[in-house]
A protein has these predicted regions:
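A short helix->beta-strand "capping" segment at the edge of beta-propeller domains
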Residues: 1-14, 45, 165-170, 360-361
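WD40/WD-repeat beta-propeller blade N-cap
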Residues: 10-17, 52-58, 94-101, 174-182, ...
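Hydrophobic beta-strand positions that form the internal "hydrophobic ladder"
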Residues: 29, 70, 113, 194, ...
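Conserved strand-to-loop turn within each blade of WD40 beta-propeller repeats
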Residues: 32-35, 73-76, 116-123, 197-200, ...
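Short loop/turn segments that connect beta-strands within beta-propeller blades
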Residues: 43-46, 84-87, 132-135, 208-211, ...
Length: 404
């Protein structure tokens, strides 16, 4: 692995980063922070496109698959609805009780909006599912396009922003187990099922259509902080407070592998699956024309452009990956609990981002780019974005880490 890597630093937050999301087309990154802001970044030129203001720490965000709406949940238990194409705050949603909102997601067909939360100061937690159209609908005359409603203006200064009670719940799933809470949920299997992580290290699959629990397995000894699903390869990865990452078969719900990146135990706050094209792939049937020294340039698909390797390290990488057209990666980040960060050396805090080959378990890259825990990761193709307790947002080229 090379000690030189490619990183972009996006500067604009003053407090810890809570969550990152790519737009569905990969053009923008959205970063939610404890400084009450969500920033929409055009990361290719390191510029801010818009700033979305709350009155409290913004802890969770999600984007509709139509690339039109963003929903953001804050520490005051409010959800704001934004039109990310016009940069307008459509409305904010309040609830009858004060909730800790721990995850927001939208179904792949944009039919449903799913929220994981617990009542403030109480143990009970639940998952509330709404029709997305009920969440975003608003009377046309209440949508303003004036300059005063652009998102660079703090929300408390805006006029005519509709505040309303949450619509009727379409379906609710309650956590019936004692001494545990739901942490995160999302739709899976063509929106027929819901994947749920819990505080006690259990991952559950719930049948959304028939309202029955399909599977419930304990994959960790402590809270599952994050998970990600890859449907093409039929896998789930989970990261936990116990310092381990699990690889799970989506279809059988059985454990395939365990990864323990850091010893002693550090919190693994976030995990993501990345599937990248392999620049060392040897096209079948072309071995007579192409040897390990002259590989086909997969990026340009031009037979006249051959890749020549200058050293033995490149040859070893080519040999390792040449039979795989795509490489499936597990990316994980975390670190020591933030309350201990000020007394810990950077290298001792476990603040590295680690990339594994999902199926072999081999560590392919490890890099340190934050001065504190990595709180959140987001992946789009071969780009990985990380947000830290140090308030920084970093954009990394995965191929540069793996192949340069």
């Amino acid at each position: 692995m090379s000690s030189v890597y490619k990183t972009k630093n996006l500067q604009g937050h003053e407090r810890p980063i809570k969550q990152l999301k790519f737009s569905k087309d990969g053009k923008y990154i959205f970063s939610a922070s404890a400084d009450r802001k969500v920033i929409k970044w055009n990361y290719k030129n390191n510029s801010k496109d818009s700033v979305y203001m709350h009155n409290a720490s913004v802890n969770v965000i999600c984007l509709s698959n139509s690339n039109k709406y963003m929903l953001s949940g804050d520490g005051a238990g409010l959800i704001y609805v934004w039109d990310i194409n016009t940069n307008e705050n459509i409305k904010k949603i309040t609830f009858d009780k004060l909730y800790n909102i721990t995850s927001l997601n939208v179904s792949s067909d944009d039919t449903y909006f799913i929220m994981t939360c617990s009542e403030r100061g109480k143990q009970n937690s639940f998952i509330a599912i709404y029709l997305l159209e009920d969440i975003i609908k608003i009377e046309k005359e209440e949508i303003k396009t004036e300059t005063e409603n652009k998102l660079q203006v703090p929300s408390e200064m805006k006029k005519n922003i509709k505040t309303e009670k949450a619509p009727n719940v379409f379906k609710q799933i309650n956590c019936t187990k004692e001494n545990t809470k739901f942490i995160k949920s999302c739709f899976t299997n063509m929106n027929k099922s819901i994947l749920i992580s819990r505080e006690d290290g259990i991952l559950e699959m719930y049948d959304f259509t028939n309202d029955t629990l399909i599977s419930s397995e304990k994959f960790h000894t402590s809270e599952i902080l994050d998970f990600d699903v890859n449907y093409e390869n039929g896998i789930i990865i989970t990261s936990s407070k116990d310092g381990e990452m699990s690889l799970i078969n989506l279809n059988t719900f059985k454990l395939m592998n365990k990864f323990k990146p850091i010893n002693p135990v550090r919190l693994l706050n976030s995990c993501q699956i990345a599937v990248i094209d392999n620049p060392y792939y040897v096209v079948p049937g072309m071995k007579s024309e192409i040897s390990i020294d002259t590989l086909f340039d997969l990026n340009t698909m031009d037979i006249t452009k051959l890749r020549y390797f200058e050293n033995e390290s490149d040859k070893e990488k080519a040999q390792k990956f040449k039979n795989k057209k795509q490489i499936v990666l597990a990316c994980v980040g975390g670190g020591q609990d933030s309350k201990f960060v000020t007394t810990t050396q950077q290298k001792e805090g476990g603040f590295e981002i680690i990339i594994y080959n999902v199926f072999t378990g081999e560590k392919l890259a490890e890099f340190l780019d934050h001065f504190g825990p990595v709180n959140t990761l987001a992946v789009y193709k071969d780009i990985i974005c990380s947000g830290g307790e140090d308030s920084s947002v970093k954009v990394h080229d995965i191929k540069h880490y793996l192949f340069s």
